[in-house]
Structures are given as C-alpha cells and as structure tokens.
C-alpha cells in the first residue's frame, strides 16, 4: 500500500461503502498495518487493519481480530504518537 494514501473506501458485507481516513501505516514483524478512522463520523475509536495479499497477489485489508496481534498494533501506534508529542 502506498504510504501517501490519505483516505480509503471500504465496503462491508452488506455492500455499504464507508470512507476512512488513514491515520498511519505501521510495519511490525514483517507485516504491514494501517490504522484508520471513519471520515464522516464522530468516533474516538480507530480501527486496525492488516495488509495481506489475496490469491491473485492483490492487496486486501483484513481486520485485526486476534487480541495478541491487536495489542501489538495498539502498542506500536501509542508508542509512535507518544514520541511525536
């Protein structure tokens, strides 16, 4: 995924499209992640997505659902933003 992407549009299981603002991209243990927030909604909660490749070699975004993996991404995110302040 290009590091200069500011927004992405994701489609849910019901076909509803939602635009997300990309907060940051993280490289952790040879995997890539993006942290996003819904662009037009007032929410304080970010969503962590892992960048994987499908069978055709195309990049796909997969929700981080495993607690251990999510905690690793959250810790890296918090460390990154605490250093910027």
UniProtKB/Swiss-Prot annotation:
Disulfide bonds: none annotated. It comes from the Bacteria. InterPro entries: UPF0473 (IPR009711). PANTHER family: UPF0473 PROTEIN CBO2561/CLC_2432 (PTHR40066), UPF0473 PROTEIN CBO2561_CLC_2432 (PTHR40066:SF1). Belongs to the UPF0473 family. This is UPF0473 protein CLK_1946. It comes from Clostridium botulinum (strain Loch Maree / Type A3).
């Amino acid at each position: 995924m290009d590091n200069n992407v500011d927004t992405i549009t994701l489609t849910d299981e019901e076909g509803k499209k939602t635009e997300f603002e990309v907060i940051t991209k993280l490289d952790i243990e040879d995997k890539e992640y993006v942290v996003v927030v819904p662009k037009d909604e007032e929410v304080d909660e970010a969503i962590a997505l892992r960048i994987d490749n499908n069978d055709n070699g195309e990049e796909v975004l997969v929700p981080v659902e495993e607690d251990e993996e999510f905690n690793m991404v959250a810790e890296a995110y918090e460390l990154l933003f605490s250093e910027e302040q």
